[in-house]
Amino acid sequence: MKGYRTARAVGWIFRFVFTLLVFAVVGLVIWRIFLSAKIPKSVRYLQPNEVLSAAYEANDGNLTFRRQEQTSITRGEKNNGYFSVVDCVFIPEAEQVQIVFRYNNSTIRHLAADYGLEKIPEKSETLFDVTLLRTTDLTPDDTSDNGDPSTLSSERIYPTSANRAESSLYTFYRFVFDGVRIEDDTDGVFADVYYLGALDYSDVPYGALCLYASGDKWLSRPLSAGDKKVLEG
């Protein structure tokens, strides 16, 4: 009887220790993912340039910072989860847009498979071209035909600057785009992603995310203490 109780106690201790280890491992994985997903400090805050600084000074620091609630991660059949925009701000007084663009390490593996590359590119390589596509409604009095490409014109806007940062699981870029005007006939603004090794703007982008859609509600984008610090510089 004594041996039975001892064996039972040992079994209980073993199960307890095993369960504890499982929870510890799961907790460590979740914590690692959380830390990796957090925007690194070097790209977390607004990136002032001459355009933004001039607008900030001209308006006595009273700038509008806004965004829209749009899908922040690609959900297409061929790019599901590949790319995301984890921060976006429109600053109309400066005619500027800033975004934080992010992709996972697994996206690089998918890239190699999708484009038939001989080997998986190094994480440190610059792999993607990111631009904005601004579409304008040529028939603003009739929005029912906006699904017809012939009723829209488009303008591609290239980044003024790009700052890069990495975590263990992700690669981040803060892109600054100047000359982005949202007017009454602006139909949409999209972040287009192309693989640099096969860059052709006439092709469908590898990934695309809507940043602005005509008629959708604007939301205030609060400034963090870090944003205010760099603006007041």
Which residue ranges define each predicted feature?
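Alpha-helical, hydrophobic structural elements that either
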Residues: R15-F23, G27-G233
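N-terminal Lys/Arg-rich, disordered targeting/topogenic segments
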Residues: M1-W12
